[in-house]
Amino acid sequence: MKPPVILINYKAYENSYGKKSIEITKKIEKVSKEYGTEIIVSVPATMIHRISEESELTVFAQHVDSGEQGARTGAILPEMIKDAGARGSLLNHSERRIRLDEMAESLERIRVLNLESVVCVDRYELVLPVALLRPNAVLIEPPELIGTGIPVSKAKPEAITKAVEEIKKTKDVYLLAGAGITTGEDVFKAIELGADGIGAASAVMKAKEPEKVVEDFVKNAIKAMEKRGE
């Protein structure tokens, strides 16, 4: 994982699984190859193996459970997603919250397995406590803006700038910004404010031409990083 980080969360939209999921993945992969930029796709557990086999994108799970292997019906463990082909996992999304102790345990096992992790938080005050658990990145997403099309970089720029101040107190943990990220301009602004990348979902998954949305994201992410001299 290296900036600019572009993470697309497939969630559980109708095109997040099956043939439609493969189609949108291929479109995203084309953009990734054209611009030489890594794009992370966080996909349903049932699609991890298929997407990792049929594309060269970095595939993440959307969640993993804490706890050991054993009599744990329905659990999705780090060992399982690695075996399926995932290279990491999203954790603690506002739609799938977990306790801090569960987060710490999952992150430890993710590291042992040489997987990567992106942990979501809903406010800047949580950035440092979570970053101290040593994920690869912390994604700040004010929940009231998720799925609204109102970007955090415009509606709450201070959430990003304050989060940047917090992440600088740690080492080797990236800061991503999400919630309402819809256009390349939103991406540019988020990175200009100090984020190392972005997370998005509905802007891509609900788009008529998702490849154009992703291309807009990537072009502006690259431009913003160049402006920062990185």
UniProtKB/Swiss-Prot annotation:
Which SUPFAM superfamilies did the record assign? Triosephosphate isomerase (TIM) (SSF51351)
Q: Where along the chain is the active site annotated? A: 93 (electrophile), 141 (proton acceptor)
Q: Which GO terms describe its cellular component?
A: cytosol
Q: Name one GO biological process term.
A: gluconeogenesis
Q: Under which EC number(s) is this enzyme classified? A: 5.3.1.1
- Do you know which CDD domains this protein is assigned to? TIM (cd00311)
Q: In which pathway does it act?
A: Carbohydrate biosynthesis; gluconeogenesis; Carbohydrate degradation; glycolysis; D-glyceraldehyde 3-phosphate from glycerone phosphate: step 1/1
Name-wise, this protein is Triosephosphate isomerase
Q: What is the originating organism of this protein? A: Sulfolobus acidocaldarius (strain ATCC 33909 / DSM 639 / JCM 8929 / NBRC 15157 / NCIMB 11770)
The gene is tpiA
